[in-house]
């Protein structure tokens, strides 16, 4: 080690000596190196999405599962021709399917943009305005709570204790006369 420089066993030059166990970028410890290689960092913005199960948290289980049978039904004794019923079923199902896809194609990205902006603003306000205001309020209210506590213990406690003692001596006897 000369002039504040350090060369490790692999010939890498460092300005500051490396500790025996290494550092976070180049650990000497084999267990530490394996531990760092095992950790996988996931980024919420680049995670893979499931294209099969698009509602993994079941947000829309009771809302949008509307099939032909949920909307149109013919009671017993009032049936249309079988061909009409089949064509109606196919028309309803295909129209719902493709019209949803068309609306998703036209408005899906703009709505995602709008909702993304909305929730970003909501998160920003919660993090930078709501929580600090609540914390500030709780800090400021502490002095008021101390004054209030002193007031209650000084004036209200003796008053209500005296009133309680007065009313504790009242006795009621009820007799039923025939």
UniProtKB/Swiss-Prot annotation:
The modification Phosphoserine is found at residues 2, 9. It is a peripheral membrane protein. It is found in: Golgi apparatus membrane; Cell membrane; Membrane, Caveola; Membrane raft. Residues 149-160 are annotated as: Interacts with SPRY1, SPRY2, and SPRY4. Pfam families: Caveolin. The modification Phosphotyrosine is found at residues 6, 14, 25. There is a cross-link at residues 5, 26, 30, 39, 47, 57 (Glycyl lysine isopeptide (Lys-Gly) (interchain with G-Cter in ubiquitin)). GO terms for molecular function: molecular adaptor activity; oxysterol binding; protein kinase binding; transmembrane transporter binding. Homooligomer. Interacts with GLIPR2. Interacts with NOSTRIN. Interacts with SNAP25 and STX1A. Interacts (via the N-terminus) with DPP4; the interaction is direct. Interacts with CTNNB1, CDH1 and JUP. Interacts with PACSIN2; this interaction induces membrane tubulation. Interacts with SLC7A9. Interacts with BMX and BTK. Interacts with TGFBR1. Interacts with CAVIN3 (via leucine-zipper domain) in a cholesterol-sensitive manner. Interacts with CAVIN1. Interacts with EHD2 in a cholesterol-dependent manner. Belongs to the caveolin family. This is Caveolin-1. It comes from Muntiacus reevesi (Reeves' muntjac).
């Amino acid at each position: 080690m000369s002039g504040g420089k350090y060369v490790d066993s692999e010939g890498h030059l460092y300005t500051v000596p490396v500790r025996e166990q290494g550092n976070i970028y180049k650990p000497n410890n084999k267990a530490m190196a394996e531990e760092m290689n095992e950790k996988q960092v996931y980024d919420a913005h680049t995670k893979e999405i499931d294209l099969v199960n698009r509602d993994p948290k079941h947000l829309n289980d009771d809302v949008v599962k509307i099939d032909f049978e949920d909307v149109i039904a013919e009671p017993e004794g009032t049936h249309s021709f079988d061909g009409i019923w089949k064509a109606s079923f196919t028309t309803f199902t295909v129209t719902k399917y493709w019209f949803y896809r068309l609306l998703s194609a036209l408005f899906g990205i703009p709505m995602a943009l709008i909702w993304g902006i909305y929730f970003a603003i909501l998160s920003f306000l919660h993090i930078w305005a709501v929580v600090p205001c609540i914390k500030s309020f709780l800090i400021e209210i502490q002095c008021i709570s101390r004054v209030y506590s002193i007031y209650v213990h000084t004036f209200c406690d003796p008053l209500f204790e005296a009133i309680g003692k007065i009313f504790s001596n009242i006795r009621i006897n009820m007799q039923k006369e025939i």
